[in-house]
UniProtKB/Swiss-Prot annotation:
GO terms for cellular component: cytosol; plasma membrane. Ca(2+) 3 binds at residues 76, 79, 82. Binds 3 Ca(2+) ions per C2 domain. PROSITE patterns: C2 (PS50004), PH_DOMAIN (PS50003), RAS_GTPASE_ACTIV_1 (PS00509), RAS_GTPASE_ACTIV_2 (PS50018), ZF_BTK (PS51113). Residues 318-546 form the Ras-GAP domain. It is a peripheral membrane protein. This is Ras GTPase-activating protein 4B. It comes from the Eukaryota. Ca(2+) 6 binds at residues 204, 207, 210. It is found in: Cytoplasm, Cytosol; Cell membrane.
Length: 803
């Protein structure tokens, strides 16, 4: 059994932000931190006070996280980025909204005394003395303290206060992972209600000391338990009066949804998985109850999630093609008009969307990547709508004469024709590159539609059915929003965005088979008609070849593609292998090309290099971040592994930004999560000279000073399938609509009482719906008998509520 938490985060837009630049504008971006750990950075939107981001993320976390904070920053090229403001949502706040937090939130000023992080290790004892009881507080160590100095560290000490008496530990220089092992004693009086306050501070020689956080201990509770030892989370000082600046710093529109799940062992989900798979295998030949019922009881707002979960479950069982084929038949059975076929947000449409993103994303990158990159690099002004042509955006064609509107339109048409032609040519050449399971699925779709709508008058309908998914729901959205499909790291500027939009419209016209209705919508697209008309013929030829795949060819192609073992992640990184001697500087990193597969992390000078080194995946013990001070630069991670002789080794890799850092960490953690010998602790610093830079320990192979974060990952399109989690999510959905399922069961069984599943299947054959209700009942009992699924609270009962 495993407890898992996932955060869905959508950063929509900001408004009324203050101007930070001398131009009266700002260059805003967002940093998202979970418990003060940066995990996401949005793109920068230049020169605006009302930025639109529209970025979505799914973050997997341990259920013990406390808060997520959104920092709006202003990017500066020459100086440090300015902090505009922040929005902080605690775990309890998010959990109090079952459907998620959604709306505008005012930005507040960032108070240094509230920017605390880390934990402190304390041992607390009450023991009898000669005249009165004594309170003994041992301050052992701390970890992950906030760096307050410019060198990326702090000089921490601890101040312990009780009943007017104050004691302080020694100062540990340049460490966010200090060790003190100092003990203080105080006299306890009967009935005394005062709390014990333990504060961490950063010592400064010239300026005032910086607050690092505090813990308030309930002494009365400590009297009862007599002794307590553990890690206590540092809290901000909330006794200070806050400035009322809400609204002055602008607002941020967010969507945040928390999902907590208790995932049972695989054996508990087997009856549910077998039942659903049996229904799909029977297809339209069986009773056909469950899949239509699931669609019928699924609301519009959760249909995409349900479709994705079902698709991933059947993909893991090798039944994705059969599942989608069943949905195609169900949709066709209730469709009489060809112009509405697969145009609604049905379970079939949503499932195919998810299917293409899971199974076809690498194919999409291969076809669209070069064209999208060229559009971004050229940055040409492109416009076909005469009412939107602006001369100031055009520039000059010669030394003196600006271009006329007609010249702009003609040049724009030429540019778009070139891009569209290149895209269609790339698509025509990509038949063999398309995954076999995608080709086989489209083959089934093509055949089903042709069977449902035979005749010459419906000749184009099977082609339009395929393009409604391939072009309208996959290629066109990727062209319009390349960042959301991981084709680019940043959003397009206004000029490039307009070019992409026009190109996407042209692709849609080709996908619609150049129908008169699509032509009539925007007459100014007429200059592209020759290319669109030619593209229709190319696209029909491509689809004819795409769906021309037999079972044997499908298996052969699948085997060929699987032997290639596509990388989980790849790209250039900088590597440093420390020998522990001399200063470690960022300049000592060497640029190499890395490729992570399900077998190894390999690296070479170039992607095509024949000679490469590798780290076996089974030898990886942890993948974690490195303190900024260690190399004088940020975005460094470490891969801790063992060599063939079993000796521990560490490779330090530098990324170019926080997003790339977290993407690589996520990928490494996901593929190594089931390794034996994973570390529970590590050193976030480096071993320099004779000690660790983080905690100053002198034992190189000793226990780490910080806990590993193997469960903190970002969800990506190429994540490994998690069958148990998908089954749990499907169970959770079915549990939510159980009343509707019982209602349908009563209708089918002639008014039987709700909650009474037939118990004698030998006398009356138990239908699939009755079996499903029985499975849900068994899973509910399994969850009830397991430990509580709610996230654990703080391990210490001595923390006093701070207001």
């Amino acid at each position: 059994m495993a407890k898992r938490s996932s955060l869905y985060i959508r950063i929509v837009e900001g408004k009324n932000l203050p101007a930070k630049d001398i131009t009266g504008s700002s260059d805003p971006y967002c940093i998202v931190k979970v418990d003060n750990e940066p995990i996401i950075r949005t793109a920068t939107v230049w020169k605006t006070l009302c930025p639109f981001w529209g970025e979505e993320y799914q973050v997997h976390l341990p259920p013990t996280f406390h808060a997520v904070a959104f920092y709006v920053m202003d990017e500066d090229a020459l100086s440090r980025d300015d902090v505009i403001g922040k929005v902080c949502l605690t775990r309890d706040t998010i959990a109090s909204h079952p459907k998620g937090f959604s709306g505008w939130a005012h930005l507040t000023e960032v108070d240094p005394d509230e920017e605390v992080q880390g934990e402190i290790h304390l041992r607390l004892e009450v023991w009898p003395g000669a005249r009165a009881c004594r309170l003994r507080c041992s301050v052992l160590e701390a970890r992950d303290l906030a760096p307050k100095d410019r060198n990326g560290t702090s000089d921490p000490f601890v101040r312990v206060r009780y009943k007017g008496r104050t004691r302080e530990t020694s100062i540990v220089k340049k460490s966010c992972y200090p060790r003190w092992n100092e003990t203080f004693e105080f006299e306890l009086q009967e009935g005394a209600m005062e709390a014990l306050c333990v504060e961490a501070w950063d010592w400064d020689l010239v300026s005032r000391n910086d607050f690092l956080g505090k813990v308030v201990i309930d002494v009365q509770r400590l009297r009862v338990v007599q002794q307590e030892e553990g890690w206590f989370r540092l809290q901000p000082d909330q006794s200070k009066s806050r400035r009322h600046d809400e609204g002055n710093l602008g607002s941020l529109q967010l969507e945040v949804r928390l999902r907590d799940e208790t995932v049972l062992p695989s054996s508990y989900y087997q009856p549910l998985v077998h039942l659903l798979c049996h229904e799909v295998k029977l297809g339209m030949q069986g009773p056909g109850q469950l899949i239509p019922l699931i669609e019928e009881t699924t609301s519009t707002e959760c249909r995409q999630d349900v479709a994705t979960n079902l698709l991933k479950l059947f993909l893991g069982q090798g039944l994705a093609k059969d599942f989608l084929d069943l949905l195609f038949q169900l949709e066709l059975s209730r469709t009489s008009e060809t112009n509405t076929l697969f145009r609604s947000n049905s379970l079939a449409s949503k499932s195919v969307e998810s299917f293409l993103k899971v199974a076809g994303m690498q194919y999409l990158h291969g076809v669209l990547g070069p064209i999208i990159n060229k559009v971004f690099e050229e940055k040409k002004y492109v416009e076909l709508d005469p009412s939107k042509v602006e001369v100031k955006d055009v520039g000059c064609s010669g030394l003196h004469r600006p271009q006329t509107e007609a010249e702009v339109l003609e040049q724009s048409a030429q540019t778009l024709r070139a891009h569209l032609g290149a895209l269609l040519s790339a698509l025509s050449r990509s038949v063999r590159a398309c995954p076999a399971v995608v080709r086989a699925t489209f083959r089934q779709l093509f055949r089903r539609v042709r069977e449902r709508f035979p005749g010459a008058q419906h000749e184009n309908v099977p082609f339009i059915a395929v393009t409604s998914f391939l072009c309208l729901r996959f290629f066109s959205p990727a062209i319009m929003s390349p960042k959301l499909f991981h084709l680019r790291e940043r959003h397009a500027d206004a000029r490039t965005s307009r070019t992409l939009l026009l190109l996407a419209k042209a692709v849609q016209n080709v996908g619609n088979m150049d129908t008169p209705a699509s032509r009539a919508k925007e007459a100014w697209m007429e200059p592209l008609q020759p290319t669109v008309h030619q593209g229709v013929a190319q696209l029909k030829d491509f689809i004819t070849k795409l769906v021309d795949i037999e079972e044997k060819d499908e298996l052969d192609l699948q085997r060929t593609l699987s032997l290639q073992a596509p990388p989980v992640k790849e790209g250039p990184l900088f590597i440093h292998r420390t020998k522990g001697k001399g200063p470690l500087m960022s300049s000592s990193f060497k640029k190499l090309y890395f490729s992570l597969t399900t077998e190894a992390l390999s690296f070479a000078k170039t992607p095509s290099s024949k000679k490469s080194a590798l780290i076996k995946l089974a030898n990886i013990r942890a993948a974690e971040k490195v303190e900024e001070k260690s190399f004088g630069g940020s975005h460094v991670m470490q891969v801790i592994y063992t060599d063939d002789a079993g000796r521990p080794q560490t490779a330090y890799l530098q990324c170019k930004c926080v997003n790339e850092l977290n993407q690589w960490l996520s990928a490494l953690r996901k593929v190594s999560i089931n390794n034996t010998g994973l570390l529970g602790s590590y050193h976030p610093g480096v071993f320099r000279g004779d000690k660790w830079s983080c905690c100053h320990q002198k034992e190189k192979t000793g226990q780490g000073c910080d806990k590993t974060r193997s469960r903190v990952t970002l969800q990506e399109w190429n994540d490994p399938l998690d069958h148990d989690l998908e089954a749990q999510l499907i169970y959770r959905h079915l549990l939510g609509v159980e009343a509707m399922l019982w209602e349908r069961h009563r209708e089918l069984s002639g008014g039987a009482e709700a909650g009474t599943v037939p118990t004698s299947p030998g006398k009356v054959p138990e239908d699939s719906l009755a079996r499903l209700l029985r499975v849900l009942q068994d899973l509910r009992e399994a969850h009830s008998s397991s430990p509580a699924g709610s996230p654990p609270s703080e391990p210490n009962c001595l923390l006093e509520l701070q207001t």
